[in-house]
Amino acid sequence: GVTGLHLHPSDIGGAILSVDRTDDWDAWPWAGPGWRDHIHTGVVQRISAVEVQAESPLAMAERWSEVLGRQNTDRSIVLDDAEIRFVEATDGRGEGVSGLELVAAQSGDFEICGVRVSLISDGG
């Protein structure tokens, strides 16, 4: 089976935090049946980091650290296969997701709706 806990930004700050658990990680029920047939990794392989901006990034990192049961190291929380980084809000948008880092076939940077996206080459 699968269970999930979703915490609203008013509870934890920054963004909705979804903490999900499944008996079989490879059979991700949230994605529906046959989701693996639709994976295309020729351009992007995975998300390696998300950046969340805050008025007080250290305080937000500590809150998230406590909820996730993971250590906050210099405003960064390392997960099993990715990282959450907390940075100062400087663009006037307030708290929220401010950047994504994706492992991709080619490197580059662009912006979508104020969110910076960094493509990090997989070296292939």
Residue ranges and their predicted role:
Residues 56-71:
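Amphipathic alpha-helical segments
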Residues 1-49, 75-124:
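Vicinal oxygen chelate
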